[in-house]
Amino acid sequence: MAKKVLVLATNYGSWGEELQAPWDALNKAGFNVTLATPLGKKPLPLAVSVDPDFVDPIINFNVNPPEVCARIKELTDGDEWANPLTFKEAKMENYDAIVLTGGLGAMIDMCNSYNVHKLLMDAYRANKLIGGLCYAIASLVYTRDPKNDYKSIIFGKQITAHPRAWDFYGADWDFTYDLYGATEDNKGTDVHTPGFLWPLEDLVRDAVGENGACISRINASRIDPEVHVDWPFVTGTSVESSIAYGDLIVEVLNNLDKYKKDGPYNK
């Protein structure tokens, strides 16, 4: 029987490829994939993430290949993402794995969401695979384990993080969350933030503690991506690692005998 995977995405602006790449990988692998968002509305990509001419101003690199932008627009304009569950409606007992996808909007409507934390804690207790990419990893940081003095569920683990050196941060930043495909009923947020909301690298370093490791390699790239497995977690650094993230989740789910280890709730 095909494994069932729950994919979470933000309604306030995904980085298109960070949803598209794992989504396509999971479906291509033949898994039964269900999408959930905070509002139960189609997840829309940030407009800059589907602009093939966009050059990241921090790393001075064009991060959106034209063929990737075209595929994201195809998914956004079509029906595959049209009718997601809400986070509250989703029940972890119905799935074999939970996969969080990134984007700057995840810092607003995912990272401190009770419903996301409940799904993650239920997956953690059941020793199911938990995936996190880029800024969605903040949701792992803030999911706390009552059995471990309310430390993060990633305490003691090796977890990737979007590097501090890549953050949009500085005196004059005014970041908006303009979406591709926005409608009157699904237009995201008009909030302005002074760059990225939080430095994820710092959050992860604090959350994993001295016995864990924050993997935050500033030279990660499409040809040399950064993804990592430390059961039950599969994590990826940022957009350049989106394809590798999806592929690694498929690899782990297809080879649980190799990767799965006892968790704190089933020892």
Which residue stretches match the model-derived regions?
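Glycine- and acidic-residue-rich phosphate-binding/metal-coordinating active-site segment common to enzymes
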Residues: 129-130
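Short, thiol/selenol-centered motifs that function as redox-active sites or metal-ligating centers
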Residues: 133-137
